[in-house]
Amino acid sequence: DVTIERSGNGFFLARAEWKHYLNKPLITPREGNFAVSRRFYAVNKQGNTFSRGEPRYAFKAGELVMTELNLKAQKGSEYLLLEDMIPAGFEPLTQNEFAELGDFRYDGYANSPAAVTRLDDRVALANTYLGKDSFVPRAFYRAVFPGKYQAMPAQGGLMYYPDTFAYSASDVITISE
């Protein structure tokens, strides 16, 4: 039990910090008709030009971060949905920041999502037709809160057949000040 008491008048400010650790291993990928993988990259910006840095799992607060998802499926699959769970400590980019990325938002037309929806806990990337054997869209975030976090797996599959899905492994991400 934690008890906080106050005596006297005036402004009162309290701060509490809680850490919780599970003694469980990281989530391993689930594959079936599909396979999903995810990599994190720092995004380098020089003027109005953006480039992908090396894959890594440690970032500094304020850094622009890209996740590249890879959904492997049978060529010709239709109505695919990939969901990238927003890692704790990160924020999705604003619409203006996202627009500044221009063509860097996707790698070729085949990997351009038909729709992108940003929700509180995930970014959903949809594709209507798979012209190759994989769909590799990108999602962008900003590292905000320092800490060490376990990122939930990305998941994907057919929109209208929810039993056909796969998910990636979970990742451990570190954000420093």
Question: Where are these predicted regions, by residue range?
Answer:
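Long, domain-scale non-catalytic interaction/scaffolding regions in large secretory-pathway
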Residues: 1-177
